[in-house]
Amino acid sequence: MKCVLGVETSCDETAVALYDGERGLLAHRVYSQIAIHAEYGGVVPELASRDHIRKILPLIKAALDDAALSKENIDGIAYTKGPGLIGALMVGASVAKSLAYAWRVPVVGVHHMEAHLMALQLEESRPAYPFIALLVSGGHTMLVHVEQPGRYKILGESVDDAAGEAFDKTAKLLGLPYPGGPALARLAEQGEPKRFIFPRPMVNQPHLNFSFSGLKTHAVNCFKQYGGEEQTRADIACAFENAVVDTLIIKCLRALEKTGINTLVLVGGVAANKKLRERLGQVAVKRAAQIYYPRQEFCTDNGAMVAYTGWLRLNAGEKEDKIIRVKPRWSMAELNIIN
């Protein structure tokens, strides 16, 4: 299997990419639906699905043009099978399987979280296996022991709101535009870090699970007590971000200590957070640990990570039939080891 087309439509980004086993990433295109969902303050699933339908085929054509390839050069197709929004997933699955049937090439469904874990394999500097991954993407926050591709052990995960969800909900409370996470991080830069001190949830417990819903409640209480003046909003944002970042770092260090592994990987949309990257980098230097994270464009949802993961699984002999199936909920424990 040489050249694989990757299709990503799990939420509000329509993304495609072409990955070649010999030449690497040949092209990738991403169309964001931020402008569509901004007026609603969050993703509207029906609108997301409809916009994927409009954008997916033109994006595939654009990626093929970027790489100076045609359909005859495609050896396989990968698409995001789950987890995600069911309607959005169905668009990507339908297009991928239809093209695979028309072009007579194999097709495979990819786990969205596994694709995030594999994003670093697109970089020149890659971690050696095994490593610990902090995966913070949308509705997921988890610490994963990655022994090899396809062999994963979940060490801890969010028991209520994930970090990304807590960022978005707190941003909405503060009257910030969608997408809330980046807007909150920008506002936090103007905040006074010592005015409010939020709790660091579950850090005194021995397990590696996360809970961020209490931080959102804490922000609500501060907002009600001190009002919505601009500086107060910035101070609340700063306190919230510091609490989330500290909690993630404490749990990461505990995971490294428990496993004896000294390599940490940071992936997913929240991995683009500037403060989290800076603080983890500082901690890694003190601990003499190795830390890796992908470039910003590969932190958020993209087709490149899907194309690469699909390339791995297709070359391991995996392929699917013509029936269109998606998995809006899909545990990583169900994945096969890639040999």
Curated annotation (Swiss-Prot):
Compartment list: Cytoplasm
EC number in record: 2.3.1.234
Positions with a binding annotation for substrate: L135, V136, S137, G138, G139, D168, G181, N273
This protein's record includes keyword tRNA processing: yes
Residue positions binding Fe cation: H112, H116, D301
This protein's UniProt keywords: Acyltransferase, Cytoplasm, Iron, Metal-binding, Transferase, tRNA processing
Listed cofactors: Fe(2+)
Cofactor: how bound: Binds 1 Fe(2+) ion per subunit.
InterPro entries: ATPase_NBD (IPR043129), Gcp-like_dom (IPR000905), KAE1/TsaD (IPR017861), Peptidase_M22_CS (IPR017860), TsaD (IPR022450)
Reaction catalysed by this enzyme: L-threonylcarbamoyladenylate + adenosine(37) in tRNA = N(6)-L-threonylcarbamoyladenosine(37) in tRNA + AMP + H(+)
Chief localization: cytoplasm
One GO CC term, this protein: cytoplasm
A biological process from GO: tRNA threonylcarbamoyladenosine modification
Alphabetized GO MF terms: iron ion binding; N(6)-L-threonylcarbamoyladenine synthase activity
Function: Required for the formation of a threonylcarbamoyl group on adenosine at position 37 (t(6)A37) in tRNAs that read codons beginning with adenine. Is involved in the transfer of the threonylcarbamoyl moiety of threonylcarbamoyl-AMP (TC-AMP) to the N6 group of A37, together with TsaE and TsaB. TsaD likely plays a direct catalytic role in this reaction.
Family from the record: Belongs to the KAE1 / TsaD family.
HAMAP family: TsaD
Descriptive protein name: tRNA N6-adenosine threonylcarbamoyltransferase
